[in-house]
A protein has these predicted regions:
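Charge-biased low-complexity segments
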Residues: 7-167
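Sec/Tat signal peptide C-region and signal peptidase I cleavage site
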Residues: 2-6
Length: 167
């Protein structure tokens, strides 16, 4: 049997969500329906990525340099955090669809400073309440960190993203 009940779309237009202890911003690209959802207190969302030594935009060559020391634990831990944030019903609702999670990492500490979520207004992720995204943000900031290479330390921040369907 198919559940035909309507789901609330929380993210159809630009909106600020004032929640208990935090504020989220939803920016929707007009005409494209692309949602950018993030904590309003973010430091790096929409900031230009620059080389702190030169003050210039990161070059094409610099884009391909390794910013992190090699490790094997962060990727599965990030995926686990996302999986655990969604209820069984929510996982069923978004089944077969991915959304994008972007981490903005402080190059001085290796800690995650900001987390951004990207999906479409017509995507089932638009029916997921803000509290789920907040849970992901808090858990990532608490449990994920990186060892930054000398090349990574040249940047004003490091951006790392992935697409995921919660399982």
């Amino acid at each position: 049997m198919v559940d035909l009940s309507a789901q609330t779309n929380y993210y159809r237009q630009d909106k600020t969500f004032y929640e208990e202890g935090y504020t989220y911003q939803c920016d929707v690209t007009e005409g494209a329906g692309l949602v950018n959802l993030y904590n309003k207190d973010s430091k790096y969302i929409y900031a230009k990525l620059i080389n702190r030594h030169t003050g210039e935009k990161i070059s094409r060559e610099e884009e391909f340099l390794n910013e992190f020391e090699e490790e094997t634990w962060t990727k599965p831990k990030c995926r686990s955090i996302v999986n655990n944030a969604f209820s069984s019903d929510e996982k069923q609702r978004v089944k077969g669809e991915e959304f994008i999670i972007t981490m903005y990492i402080d190059p001085d500490t290796g800690k995650v400073a900001d987390v951004e979520f990207i999906f479409m207004t017509f995507n089932p992720y638009a029916t997921i309440p803000i509290s789920v995204y907040r849970k992901i943000e808090v858990e990532i900031k608490k449990n994920i960190w990186f060892k930054i290479t000398p090349e990574g330390k040249k940047r004003n921040y490091i951006m790392l993203w992935w697409g995921q369907e919660p399982k």
